[in-house]
């Protein structure tokens, strides 16, 4: 990877350490950063352009795409069971991989499925929204809702890798793009004056 032009950050968590790759076009070059010579379940939702999941699947030796309905309602036991059944029907084993391609709902659902399938298999998160890139894809928190109670059933299951491809933001509705930047504003207020200064200038597309 001598020609890699991007940013790599490492979350130092001992045995559960993982890298965060920030690079335009990283999604279609996932094979450069991850082992895809195994069965891969690519989990996405109906609101994410289908081409993103397909780009990942096309790089894998053996893959299946699992598409769930868009929205918070997909963080349910019913949808979780659907994902797990499709993984089982795909004959996934302990050495196989789940890749989430989408926003926070997809990351939470796919990550939790990976955490509990066969007591835990590898998981890669590829966030496609500003909020999930900045916040929910990092930290290893995975969960589903129970009735009206959000994120009450879950697990801490760190991904093996997080791929942040800013090119995917080109298809994100403008209001979702701006709403997700609230987490970046908060980070700037707490720890990064230079970042906060960018928001003060109103230059949010830099």
Where are the model-predicted features located?
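Short, basic, helix/turn surface patches
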Residues: 91-101, 150-156
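Catalytic nucleophile loop
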Residues: 107
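Hydrophobic residues within alpha-helices
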Residues: 56, 110-113
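ATP/NTP phosphate-donor binding region
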Residues: 2-97, 186
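Acidic-aromatic/histidine active-site loop/patch
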Residues: 104
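A glycine/threonine-rich phosphate-anchoring loop and its flanking beta-alpha core
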Residues: 112-205
């Amino acid at each position: 990877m001598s020609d890699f032009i991007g940013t790599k950050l490492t979350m130092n968590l001992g045995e559960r350490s993982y890298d965060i790759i920030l690079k335009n076009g990283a999604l279609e070059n996932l094979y450069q950063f991850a082992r895809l010579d195994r069965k891969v379940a690519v989990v996405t939702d109906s609101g994410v352009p289908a081409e993103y999941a397909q780009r990942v699947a096309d790089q894998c030796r053996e893959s299946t795409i699992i598409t769930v309905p868009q929205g918070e309602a997909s963080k349910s036991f019913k949808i979780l069971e659907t994902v797990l059944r499709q993984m089982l029907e795909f004959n996934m084993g302990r050495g196989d991989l789940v890749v989430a391609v989408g926003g926070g709902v997809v990351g939470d659902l796919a990550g939790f499925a990976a955490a509990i399938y066969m007591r835990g298999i590898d998981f890669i998160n590829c966030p496609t929204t500003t909020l999930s890139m900045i916040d929910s894809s990092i930290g290893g928190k995975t969960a589903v809702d129970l009735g009206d109670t959000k994120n009450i059933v879950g697990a801490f299951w760190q991904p093996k890798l997080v791929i942040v491809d800013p090119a995917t933001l080109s298809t994100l509705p403008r209001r979702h793009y701006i709403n997700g930047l609230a987490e970046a504003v908060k980070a700037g207020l707490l720890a990064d004056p230079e970042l906060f200064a960018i928001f003060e200038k109103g230059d949010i597309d830099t």
